[in-house]
């Protein structure tokens, strides 16, 4: 089993549990150059809010889009957009990535901006 398939296996198990609970999910995806965050409806078929370092509004404020500062900016942006839509409580779906570094920075920034998970 390679690294990617192991991550996908971990992510699938967590997603299945969150779907059983019927929770709104804050999903994080990380690449070496960018980080993406989406708030997904409990049924899993609708993206309610999204933010990423690919967006011009976020990437213009940053020197580099693949570090903790960029992740924190995305976390703050996704939390503000979720609160505008009336979404306060979410479940954090780390997509099989280790809760460390950029993933943790995004989560901490989202919590500071007002999301609860």
Swiss-Prot record:
Top-level lineage group: Bacteria
SUPFAM superfamilies for this protein: Translational machinery components
Keywords (A to Z) from UniProt: Ribonucleoprotein, Ribosomal protein, RNA-binding, rRNA-binding
Membrane-spanning segments: none
Any one Gene Ontology molecular-function term assigned to this protein's record: structural constituent of ribosome
Pfam family, one: Ribosomal_L18p
Any GO CC annotation of this UniProt entry: cytosolic large ribosomal subunit
Family, similarity comment: Belongs to the universal ribosomal protein uL18 family.
Subunit structure: Part of the 50S ribosomal subunit; part of the 5S rRNA/L5/L18/L25 subcomplex. Contacts the 5S and 23S rRNAs.
Cited function: This is one of the proteins that bind and probably mediate the attachment of the 5S RNA into the large ribosomal subunit, where it forms part of the central protuberance.
Protein name: Large ribosomal subunit protein uL18
Species of the source: Klebsiella pneumoniae (strain 342)
